[in-house]
Amino acid sequence: MSLRDALKTPSSEITDEAVYRDRRRLLQLFALTPALSVAGCAEADPPPPPKTVVTPAQARSGFRTAEELTRLEDVTSYNNFYEFGTDKTDPSKAAKTLKLSPWSVKVSGECEKPGSLSLDELLKGISAEERIYRLRCVEGWSMVIPWTGVPLGEVLKRFAPTSRAKYVAFTTLADPQQMPGVRYRSINWPYREGLRIDEAMHPLTLLATGLYGKPLPQQNGAPLRLVVPWKYGFKSIKSIVEIRFVEKMPETAWHDLQPSEYGFFSNVNPAVDHPRWSQKTERRIAGTASKLFAERIATKPFNGYADQVASLYAGMDLKKWF
């Protein structure tokens, strides 16, 4: 399946179709009225993101939520992607020149069918899906984002992992020529993340190729990133170039840098504070809310996906295995 095919699902399936029709009419209006002043446009409040319609079955699955979406402009301008800088606005400025084609992903380790595949080959034959997920950053802010992608488990199955594959390790591209942040040792590059095999195979775990019905922007992890909605955002590794099936728990970038602050599992848990701040509440960046003064809401265990994933951790001490 080509990326173009992967993103053919109409945007009306992400949000109310009438909203998209109104948006198109608005764009046509602007095109037909050049006399509209730029100053007037700048002064107007941006429209809130569209509301979504969620069926009971979708709500139970966790694949969609009726919560107010975060505006596209906020999703694409407020990012953590240290390969392009440490400020929230750095990635949207510095990542524009990241070359997305050709792009290949190497799959190796404890599997029967390893290989290096192009993006089209990796996703071939797997139907793309729309998922509206909450994203909770370990820093204490959150968003609600409509993603396009494929279930990670469906991709991993085609490599036939063996019984020794207990974990899945992921690696981000680290190219100092394209990624200015890699020239500095703020992190032990390349960026690495990992999941337990059952977490990787869980239906909620998404290999994302787009958001808001469009291909992923570079600053959001193009062309391929993880979205693991019940974990803190740094687990959703971006711009993936390597996947390895391994027997032992892999070392991950933030745990390597500060193991007392960033655990391997990093499930969203309001009962376990970060050593330097509380995790009981979060700033929800949604609608027209200011990023700095967004409403604080209570953080839910597993980011609100406990019904779907809590059983994965039955019997575990979640304060120890944070």
Curated annotation (Swiss-Prot):
One of its GO terms (molecular function) is metal ion binding. The keyword Transmembrane does not apply. Part of the MsrPQ system that repairs oxidized periplasmic proteins containing methionine sulfoxide residues (Met-O), using respiratory chain electrons. Thus protects these proteins from oxidative-stress damage caused by reactive species of oxygen and chlorine generated by the host defense mechanisms. MsrPQ is essential for the maintenance of envelope integrity under bleach stress, rescuing a wide series of structurally unrelated periplasmic proteins from methionine oxidation. Keywords: Metal-binding, Molybdenum, Oxidoreductase, Periplasm, Signal. Mo-molybdopterin binds at residues 79, 82-83, 137, 172, 220, 225, 236-238. Its main location: periplasm. Its cofactor is Mo-molybdopterin. Belongs to the MsrP family. Predicted to be exported by the Tat system. The position of the signal peptide cleavage has not been experimentally proven. This is Protein-methionine-sulfoxide reductase catalytic subunit MsrP. Binds 1 Mo-molybdopterin (Mo-MPT) cofactor per subunit. Its EC number is 1.8.5.-. One of its GO terms (cellular component) is periplasmic space. It is found in: Periplasm. The keyword Metal-binding applies. GO terms for biological process: protein repair. Pfam families: Oxidored_molyb (PF00174). Heterodimer of a catalytic subunit (MsrP) and a heme-binding subunit (MsrQ). Residues 1-59 form the signal peptide.
